[in-house]
Amino acid sequence: MDKFQSYLGLDRSHYFLYPLIFQEYIYVLAHDHGLNGSVLLENAGYDNKSSLLIVKRLIIRMYQQNHLILSVNDSKQTPFLGHNKNFYSQVMSEVSSTIMEIPLSLRLISSLERKGVVKSDNLRSIHSIFSFLEDNFSHLNYVLDILIPYPAHMEILVQALRYWIKDASSLHLLRFFLHECHNWDSLITSNSKKAGSSFSKRNHRLFFFLYTSYVCEYESGFLFLRNQSSHLRSTSSGSLIERIYFYGKIEYLAEVFAGAFQANLWLFKDSFMHYVRYQGKSILASKGTFILMNKWKYYFVNFWKSYFYLWSQPGRIYINQLSNHSLDFLGYRSSVRLKPSMVRGQMLENTFLIDNAIKKFDSIVPIMPLVGSLAKSKFCNALGHPIGKAVWADLSDSDIIERFGRIYRNLSHYHSGSSKKKSLYRVKYILRLSCARTLARKHKSTVRAFLKRFGSRLLEEFFTEEEQVFSLTFPRVSSISRRLSRRRIWYLDIVCINDLANHE
């Protein structure tokens, strides 16, 4: 961020970001931050040097002529510097999204410094959500499963940025990219799975940036109403640019909501309410009654309709009772279960037993969706029978073993919060045998022969970090090591969901 500050000179430029698109170092920064896996280097037949040459030629052409003004009706294969225009539109859209993120990231850092937050990495962790649920959900009664609607028009997303980015030229350039992107209409859907798949295609960073800005707008309004209707101040543990303006827009929102909701605030007073968002969905849990949750449900519908021109069906927001409902998200199945316990009491000379049920938060890994993810990645068939990874057969033996071992260690690390580890044992079996079949296919041998040859080595590769730590800490007490390895462990260094664990 120090480099960003020196490059931008924000105090002097007043957030005029448009000229930065003509600077070569911005393209380098976009590449270094891993935008879309680096579209410059993913293009077939280009290395680092030729990619930089493409950037230089692109900037020179933009200086000489206005090549940004291209007719939407032109052919997709219209040559532009020897390539089709979609390729360069994609490159420039990614760079533009990087440019617009820079001042927001700088503001986030200054905001954290003002609040005295020294390190925010733990707040970004996915596992911090589950540790939060473990501490709070056992005391709640109802939960709202909310499917966040998507804007019907991209202009709504652009307008959400007007309060963040003051450079009109950058916003006009953003509109140009949205019209150029041929898959932009795939976002016009209320199906989060379809919208999520569109993010993984072209212009991932740009659409994700626009979507998070829209979500920030809607959540800032919800946060304002939440703070006004509760005696307790809510604290935000969101991540990255989604947290930047939660508090900065309160002053503006006060004018908007004062007349519309002030008379109805008493309907929503609830001191025990928690909100979690993930992958285009959100959860609103409360200790209140069913009537209160139903009021919140229709508040969301009317709020989206009035201020974002979004039509959302009330049927897309489900009210469930936590005692008999499971939450499937982020690769876990979470629920609140009643754990029976018996207490022996004594009064004078009489003893009696008291049945007592305690609410306990539980999280497990659903095995069938996980096996389905492995089947899509060609590690096994639909029934869970391991198959060889044919595309890896050209790699060396050590690379094949290392890849399979790393996949399992990552999955085991991500699912360490599961209370039941049996599903991970099945994943370990599938990946281990798939590795053996891949090696056997490469050397035209049998699986049995390779298991005899590499048996101990294959087993070592599939040891997780936790198992190694426990075995080193308690080398002589195997029972303690096994008992500790079965407990739920939440890691605060996981900031992105594993692709195989993502069943949404």
From Swiss-Prot:
Instruction: Please report the name of this protein according to its UniProt entry.
Output: Maturase K
Q: Domain of life of the organism in this record?
A: Eukaryota
Where does this polypeptide localize?
Plastid, Chloroplast
Q: Which family does it belong to?
A: Belongs to the intron maturase 2 family. MatK subfamily.
Q: Which organism is it from?
A: Guizotia abyssinica
What this protein is reported to do is described as: Usually encoded in the trnK tRNA gene intron. Probably assists in splicing its own and other chloroplast group II introns.
Looking up InterPro entries in the UniProt record yields: Domain_X (IPR024937), Maturase_MatK (IPR002866), Maturase_MatK_N (IPR024942)
Q: Which Pfam families match?
A: Intron_maturas2 (PF01348), MatK_N (PF01824)
Keyword Plastid among record annotations: yes
Gene behind this chain? matK
Keyword check for Transport, yes or no.
no
Q: Principal localization?
A: plastid
What GO biological process term is on the record, naming one? RNA splicing
Q: Identify the keywords attached in UniProt to this record, alphabetized.
A: Chloroplast, mRNA processing, Plastid, RNA-binding, tRNA processing
Gene Ontology annotations for the cellular component aspect, listed alphabetically:
chloroplast
Q: Which GO terms describe its molecular function?
A: RNA binding
